[in-house]
Each structure stands twice: as C-alpha cells, then as structure tokens.
Amino acid sequence: MNSDEYIFNIKDILNILPHRYPFLLIDRILDFKAFQYLKALKNCTVNEPFFQGHFIKEPVFPGVLMIEAMSQAAAVLIFKSIGKLNINQLYYFVGIENTRFKKIVVPGDQIFIEVIYLKSKKNFIKFKIFAIVNKKNVCKSTIIFYKKNIFN
C-alpha cells in the first residue's frame, strides 16, 4: 500500500484522537484490522516547528516525537477496534520497552508506522510498533497503554 491509498484521512483522525496542531503527528491511516494491526503515515515537512531548532543546520525529526507518533497510531488502533468511545475510560501511555532508533528522519521523509496488537492483560495493552522510511526500519519499540475506568 502506498501513501495515496488510505482508509482514514486527517478529518477522520481528528474525530478519533484528541490531539491537535502542533501535536497531532498522524496524517493518514493506510490499513487497519481491529485488534490486530494498523498502518499509518506521517509526512515530515520542514515547516513543522521543531525542525527550526532540532537542529538548525541539520534538521532531524526528534526521537521523542517518533515515539509519540507511534503511540498516536496505537491509540487509533485501540479506539477504532473498540468502536464507540467510552467517556468513562481513559487510556494512558505508561511504558516503552526495547526501543531502538536505527536511522535519522529528515524533512521530506514519509514515516510509515506499523502497529501490531500483541496482547491485553487486565487493563494493560501492549503493541509492537515499527517506523519505516524508504522501506528501511528507522525505529522499533514496544509500547504499553493502561486503560483506566473513571466515573462521573
């Protein structure tokens, strides 16, 4: 699947995630199967504010934002898998494991994010996530969310 083919565009994503500019880091959802996997796209443009200072002569996509983009893709997988959002539940990003950054990402790159649903135990949900640029793995991580039930 390429970046021209998608199942959720930015308008759909805005209806799924609470994040907004400049912190919304997913542009499209390319593929999805509930409770199994999700493929997302992040376009990197020099106009993004963090590139102005990270770094001035050699702009590099910050690793911490790579993890955030991967987490947002995992959140879309959760929210689309459960269908209707429950206002009495919150999902917290609580952990990362075995994270490796293999290559730098620069303006003009497209980051393809592949999220694999690993397991859910009690209220913890675990994902294996890969970030890919030009068919090369630039980052991989295991990300953990915690589902908390809240009551009004």
UniProtKB/Swiss-Prot annotation:
NCBIfam families registered for this protein in UniProt: fabZ, PRK00006.1
Function: Involved in unsaturated fatty acids biosynthesis. Catalyzes the dehydration of short chain beta-hydroxyacyl-ACPs and long chain saturated and unsaturated beta-hydroxyacyl-ACPs.
Family: Belongs to the thioester dehydratase family. FabZ subfamily.
Localization terms from the record: Cytoplasm
GO function terms (MF aspect): (3R)-hydroxyacyl-[acyl-carrier-protein] dehydratase activity
Keyword Transferase carried by entry: no
Substrates-to-products reaction catalysed: a (3R)-hydroxyacyl-[ACP] = a (2E)-enoyl-[ACP] + H2O
Domain of life: Bacteria
UniProt name for this protein: 3-hydroxyacyl-[acyl-carrier-protein] dehydratase FabZ
GO cellular-component term (any): cytoplasm
Active site, per annotation: 54
CDD domains: FabZ
GO biological process, one term: lipid A biosynthetic process
Entry keyword Endoplasmic reticulum: no
Keywords on record: Cytoplasm, Lipid A biosynthesis, Lipid biosynthesis, Lipid metabolism, Lyase
Coarse class of the protein's main subcellular location: cytoplasm
Entry EC no(s): 4.2.1.59
InterPro entries registered for this protein in UniProt: FabA_FabZ, FabZ, HotDog_dom_sf
